């Protein structure tokens, strides 16, 4: 079965079985909602078990979650450092124009048929996502995911077409 990272358990939260998660999910509210099915993977990336979310809330930069049948700190402390993943079957459907991060990462980025580089990661600093584009012989390019910049995303062909606004690429 194929799984995709959605977060890392960084610590416990209180004594009632809550965990502090650093999310890397494209849809955190959906991914960590009550009833969601996730999988726990240990620090060696080995599958441990399936878990069900029974509560979720945001606190600062973290998602605070609780699993079904794990209601005390003693039951969850061993999971610190573990990774939460969603199975491909539990990902859910997307609206047109929406993408999963794993679909975008690795895509080739072009401006007017000139290869700029490849998307290596996606940041969520605020109002919009920022795609980090790895370029050959240059510093990484921070590409805001906004309509005037990202013109098209072709998932089947792993291609993104962009128009770089003035000042966006300080190495040109």
From Swiss-Prot:
One of its GO terms (biological process) is rRNA processing. The PRC barrel domain binds ribosomal protein uS19. Keywords: Chaperone, Cytoplasm, Ribosome biogenesis, rRNA processing. It holds the Pfam family PRC. The keyword Cytoplasm applies. Gene3D superfamilies: PRC-barrel domain (2.30.30.240), RimM (2.40.30.60). It comes from the Bacteria. It is found in: Cytoplasm. Belongs to the RimM family. The gene is rimM. NCBIfam families: 16S_RimM (TIGR02273). GO terms for molecular function: ribosome binding. An accessory protein needed during the final step in the assembly of 30S ribosomal subunit, possibly for assembly of the head region. Essential for efficient processing of 16S rRNA. May be needed both before and after RbfA during the maturation of 16S rRNA. It has affinity for free ribosomal 30S subunits but not for 70S ribosomes. Transmembrane segments: none annotated. Residues 96-168 form the PRC barrel domain. The keyword Chaperone applies. InterPro entries: PRC-brl_dom, PRC_barrel-like_sf, RimM, RimM_N, RimM_N_sf, Transl_B-barrel_sf. This is Ribosome maturation factor RimM. GO terms for cellular component: cytoplasm; ribosome. Binds ribosomal protein uS19.
């Amino acid at each position: 079965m194929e799984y995709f990272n959605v977060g890392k358990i960084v610590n416990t939260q209180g004594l009632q079985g809550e965990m502090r998660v650093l999310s890397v999910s494209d849809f955190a509210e959906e991914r960590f909602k009550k009833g969601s099915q996730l999988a726990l993977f240990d620090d060696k990336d080995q599958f441990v078990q399936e878990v069900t979310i029974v509560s979720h809330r945001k606190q600062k930069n973290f998602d605070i979650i609780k699993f079904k049948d794990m209601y005390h700190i003693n039951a969850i402390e061993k999971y610190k450092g573990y990774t939460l993943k969603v199975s491909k079957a539990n990902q859910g459907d997307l609206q047109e124009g929406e993408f999963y991060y794993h679909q975008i990462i690795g895509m080739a980025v072009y401006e007017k048929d000139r290869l700029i580089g490849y998307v290596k990661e996606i940041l969520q600093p605020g109002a919009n996502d920022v795609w980090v584009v790895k370029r050959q012989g240059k510093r990484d390019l921070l590409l805001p995911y906004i309509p005037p910049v990202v013109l098209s995303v072709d998932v089947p062909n792993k291609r993104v077409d962009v128009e770089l606004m003035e000042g966006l690429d300080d190495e040109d």
